[in-house]
Amino acid sequence: NDFLASGIGLLIDGHDEDVVKSVLTRDKNMAVSRHKIGSSVWSSLGDLGPAMGMIGTLIGLVAMLSNMDDPKSIGPAMAVALLTTLYGAMLANMIAIPFADKLKIRMAEEELIKTVAIDAVLAIQAGQNPRVIESMLRAYLAEGKRAKPEE
């Protein structure tokens, strides 16, 4: 883990707790900020998909209504009107929104991992007992995933 390695590197270089915490927290916050931007792009695309579908529907309906004197042109224009709505809904609900949700999950996971690393590095710097550090870090795990402490 490069993040943890950089934290340990700061300890080895002899920086005090405030510097280590500040550098690592800034790194974590910037990563979260970058992930939020990516997620918001996909969320916006999910919001725009149905709207773009409705615009296509309006274009198809205008084409259909402008050629009412030709019955053969009504079907293809109606198909365009209906398909654009379908494509907009599919783009939003099958691609953009799930992708945005997955990015949000990954962002939360990375934020947690970096928070654990910051706590571990600061505990090491404070000279805490390894068993205390271990029990402190176990608190981040769900109870079912915690290994039983060795006696």
Residue ranges and their predicted role:
Residues 27-106:
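Helix-termination/interfacial motifs at the ends of transmembrane alpha-helices
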